[in-house]
Amino acid sequence: RRGMEHGYALCVVDDEGEVICFFLLEPPGIPKMGTWDMIRAGLLGAAWKFGLASTRRLIATKDYFEASERRVLGARAGKVSRLNRLTVLPARQGQGVGSTALAAALRDVDAPVMLETQDARNVAFYERLGFAVVDEDTCPIGEYHTWSMLREGQISS
């Protein structure tokens, strides 16, 4: 819901009505979710269902990625669009669904876009769409490797 209120949310649906691709593209300047926003979005329920330790890890991970964005982008932090949650139904991966949908959205936005991925195979996928790795790091919460990638806007004529 947050992405649809504050940016570009895209669902690709097949002929049977099944969602086969989804992503959020948030424009710059969208306020980060604060503690109150997270509580309203169900944080207390998550703490009840998954426990306090898991909830603390969730908040620490969120804080880590926000700090990582500030470190990587420096003065540009908060002034760059963000790609979040690109997912394609496994049976439809490798068929051009995600790349076609994302390429169209990137043409519409025509501005710098940042993303993070924790899957090495995604790096080449995003590079084909004009993204470049600008940082690699290991998140201390969970010890997973993260690639931060940036795509500068294309100059339209």
How would you label these PLM feature ranges?
Residues R1-C11, I30-K32, G78:
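A short helix-loop-beta-strand connector motif used in the catalytic cores of GNAT acetyltransferases and
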Residues H6-L25:
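Conserved beta-hairpin
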Residues Y8-L10, K79-N84, H145-W147:
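Short beta-strand micro-motifs in enzyme catalytic cores
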Residues I20, Y144-M149:
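Short hydrophobic/aromatic beta-strand or adjacent loop that forms the aromatic wall/cage
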Residues L24-T87, Q93, P140-I141:
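Conserved acyl-donor/pantetheine-binding loop and adjacent beta-alpha core of acyl/acetyltransferases
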Residues V80-S81, R107-D119:
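Conserved GNAT acetyl-CoA-binding A-motif
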Residues R85-V88, G94-R107, R128:
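Conserved acetyl-CoA-binding loop-helix of GNAT-fold acetyltransferases
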Residues S99-T100, D119-D137, G142:
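Conserved active-site alpha-helix within GNAT-family acetyltransferase domains
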